[in-house]
Amino acid sequence: MGVDGIDKADYKKVVEHCYLCDLCYMTKCPYVPPHEWNVDFPHLMLRAKAVRFKQSGARFRDRVLTNTDQVGRLASLPVVVNAVNAANRSAPLRGVLEKTLKIHANAKLPPYHNPTLRQQLRNHESSTTDAIEITDRTQGKVALFATCYGNYNAPDLALDLVQVFEHNHIPMTLVRTEQCCGMPKFELGDLDAVARASEHNRDSLIEMIDAGWDIVAPVPSCVLMFKQELPLMFPNNADLQRIRKRIFDPFEYLYLRHRAGLLNVEFKHPLGTVAYHAACHQRVQNFGSRTKQILELVPETKLVTIERCSGHDGTYAVKLETHNASMKIVRPIVKRIQAVAPDHYGSDCPIAATQLWNGLGGDTPPRHPISLLRIAYGL
């Protein structure tokens, strides 16, 4: 059946249930280039989301969920942070949140932290004093784009990243100032907000690149935003093209250093069996299975790679009307992890990892691969 056999009233359902994982374009659809039809389904859905946003705006809940910087700043304030985290763990209060904001009571919400990552690293001085070694692709010193998630919700992840990189003689600093990369607003269809965030981040990142720093971000979606989506939105912007070439996924960067013989491979602790979920927005960057290749350097470590979408998306798994669908999507991954019975499980995407934890239940949280690498180094 072609699209002409679908009721037009159902078009919006398709748009609503596409959360731009990009996997159809990368792994499923036979009509992508070089096919003459040149179908780019994710960006077709993005266009529909943008039109819908222009015409109708967004509901209050969705504006709140995608205002990650504003929510993060408020929720991470002293005293407020304790109240927010307690409320997120309270079944009665989550029930109220479900009835009022339509945020599903069973969806795991990320914790907030005080101090934030940027507060903790405000006066950071790199622990490595070794001479910087430049390779064909890397400058050997890295400015961390913390991301709103790394700053407010998962500072320990970013701190682990700093430890691992400095253990490999890579000086680290923070990007001087940053806003959310824009991915939440992008998926909402609010492209004007994406453009505003891009202008702020572009100047900040170019400042670091001009000073000889590479850029690394701990969240795949944020890296993808700068590598793919913003350059596609603004193809004539030379600064964004420069950023695209100088921003890296953490394990992509570590692999490039390893290829040049510069990775520390003196590991102190085996990791055993690791159920590793390959994040969608990392896979579509097309730089290979670098996380797997680096972790497999650790002796007595076996990786079981799972390449399926977790169904989280940042907001899809949280919203009342789509949470149950998201849990159906993650179910095959959960069953695979249960069958493996690993020593550790996790994903490069911390939000996807939360979805795995929600599906598995229990008290054993996921571990990010960069945190596993820190453990393997004995740091």
Where are these predicted regions, by residue range?
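Residue-level signal for mature regions of secreted extracellular proteins and peptides
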Residues: Y11-H17, D22, L174, T273, ...
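Generic internal hydrophobic packing segments that stabilize the cores of diverse globular domains
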Residues: Y11-V15, M26, F41-M45
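Residues immediately within or flanking Cys/His clusters that coordinate Zn2+
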Residues: V15-C21, M26, E178, H277, ...
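N-terminal low-complexity, Ser/Thr- and acidic-residue-enriched intrinsically disordered segments
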Residues: Y25, P30-Y31, N67
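Short, non-ligating residues that shape and space the ligands of small metal-coordination modules
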Residues: T27, H35-N38
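Iron-sulfur cluster-binding electron-transfer modules in prokaryotic oxidoreductases
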Residues: V39-L379
